[in-house]
């Protein structure tokens, strides 16, 4: 029985990982128990048929929260506790430590931990195993906090349930993105690229999925490029895959991603993708599609060239590229294969 604990407020890659891997492990005969703040995370877990409970975490080390997890872990005979951020470790992690339950710290970004006393003390006292989303993320964390190199530290790629092989092209073609609406995610460069392509007479539509702290700013960036009439902002959606199914071309405009879970979701849906050559993205990129990786600090000019090429390709040629990305997803992060890897690692721990 595995507890997945996540106290973060925003939806991020680790939450998607928890739900996907929890469901896959449940189908392999394990029990999955999800704990999160009131909101979409526990609700989505329940929709997937997982056991889920809303938790009000309070401050780090909150004795009431620790007591709650002590009761829960005893009640459900939890064998492994998987946490995300420090608050998870300093509540559920402490409860797991008292009960002798192995703890895993699931990390999704090189900046998740700082080299400071609180990090050292938590790592020393709780002794969690560490699990990163990519080799890039793992290496970055060890550079930031050298002591982590002394611990059991694995890197296992994220995973998805894969639909059928892509077989359709929309008319007009649809460009879609789904990363968080944050000023650091590079949406302005994507909108600039779309503007340049539109000026060349290319007809297309754009869908921007999700929300974030700078949603209004991103919408203003879209308006400033004259794209309001062809762009749809969906806001928060509970089923990202359904939205991705409406697209043909996916753009990940982020300047740097530890792996790019949004990109993996798009590849798993069989979309032709454009991203920056940075972070962990090259680890999962199809070897034959290097021309669709633009420079890390591109202002949108190279992105415009990549978009123009995909939007004007003959249908069969674009479909072939979509199939390349889908094939890489099948090869690299099919949920059943990743669940097997995680299961094997968990058995070694337990």
Predicted regions and their residues:
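Short hydrophobic beta-strand element within catalytic cores of glycosyltransferases
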Residues: 34, 272-275
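A short, active-site helix/loop in glycosyltransferases that binds the activated sugar's phosphate group
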Residues: 127-152
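Short His-centered aromatic/hydrophobic patch
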Residues: 83-89, 107
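A conserved mid-protein helix/loop that constitutes part of the nucleotide-sugar donor-binding site
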Residues: 12-20, 173, 180-196, 202, ...
């Amino acid at each position: 029985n595995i507890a997945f604990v996540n106290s973060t407020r925003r939806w991020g890659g680790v939450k998607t990982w928890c739900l996907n891997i929890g469901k896959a492990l449940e189908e392999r005969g394990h029990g999955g128990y999800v704990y999160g703040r009131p909101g979409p995370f526990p609700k989505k877990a329940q929709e997937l048929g997982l056991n889920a409970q809303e938790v009000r975490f309070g401050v780090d080390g909150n004795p009431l929260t620790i007591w709650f997890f002590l009761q829960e872990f005893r009640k459900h005979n939890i064998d492994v506790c998987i946490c995300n951020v420090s608050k998870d470790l300093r509540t559920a992690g402490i409860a797991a430590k008292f009960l002798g339950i192995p703890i895993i710290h699931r990390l999704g970004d090189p900046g998740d931990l700082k080299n400071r006393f609180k990090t050292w003390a938590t790592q020393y006292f709780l002794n969690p195993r560490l699990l990163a989303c990519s080799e890039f993320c793992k290496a970055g964390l060890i550079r930031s906090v050298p002591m982590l190199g002394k611990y059991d530290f694995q890197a296992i790629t994220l995973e998805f349930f894969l639909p059928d092989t892509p077989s359709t092209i929309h008319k007009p073609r649809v460009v879609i993105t789904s990363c968080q609406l944050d000023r650091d995610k590079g949406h302005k460069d994507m909108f600039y690229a779309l503007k340049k392509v539109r000026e060349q007479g290319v007809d297309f539509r754009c869908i921007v999925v999700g929300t974030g702290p700078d949603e209004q700013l991103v919408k203003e960036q879209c308006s400033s490029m004259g794209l309001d009439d062809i762009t749809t902002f969906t806001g928060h959606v509970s089923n990202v895959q359904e939205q991705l199914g409406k697209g043909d071309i996916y753009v990940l405009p982020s300047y740097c991603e530890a792996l790019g879970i949004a990109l993996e979701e798009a590849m798993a849906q069989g979309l032709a993708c454009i991203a920056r050559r940075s972070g962990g993205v090259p680890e999962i990129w199809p070897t034959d599609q290097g021309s669709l990786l633009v420079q890390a600090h591109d202002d949108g000019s190279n992105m415009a060239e990549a978009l123009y090429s995909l939007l004007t390709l003959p249908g069969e040629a674009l479909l072939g590229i979509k199939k390349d990305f889908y094939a890489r997803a099948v090869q690299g992060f099919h949920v059943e294969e990743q669940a097997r890897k995680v299961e094997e690692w968990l058995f070694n721990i337990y």
